[in-house]
Amino acid sequence: MSVNDPLGDMLTRIRNAIGRKKTTVSTPASRLRARVLDVMKAEGYIRDYTQVDYDNGKSELEIQLKYLEGAPVIREIARVSKPGRRVYVSVKSIPHVANGLGIAILSTPKGVMADHEAREKNVGGEFLCQIF
């Protein structure tokens, strides 16, 4: 089956796995998905992820979800910029997610990064998703 929004598909898989209290979830691999997972890992929203390569040339990302005292660390995860409606933000208009308790993930000319890192580097970009 063809997926029109691979990043949105990954976020939905994570949201569904958290709803079912799963410890791991897998998704087809791509560089953008891996970069977003790098940011999520650095910010403490997931434990880790590994890339699993198969004999047929395809690979998947195995994501280990993080829970704190039985409650998921990720309370809310949402796609902002979608294929039908891209959302771009300048460095001055990068939002503070949940009054600074959450993060916004942006795709910038300097790579995929969290909102606070984009402010430090004084760069804007595509507002991919927000996590709280």
UniProtKB/Swiss-Prot annotation:
Pfam families attached to this UniProt entry: Ribosomal_S8
Domain of life: Bacteria
Any GO MF annotation of the entry: structural constituent of ribosome
Keyword rRNA-binding annotated: yes
Annotated HAMAP family: Ribosomal_uS8_B
Function of the protein: One of the primary rRNA binding proteins, it binds directly to 16S rRNA central domain where it helps coordinate assembly of the platform of the 30S subunit.
Protein name (record): Small ribosomal subunit protein uS8
High-level lineage: Bacteria, Pseudomonadati, Pseudomonadota, Alphaproteobacteria, Hyphomicrobiales
Underlying gene: rpsH
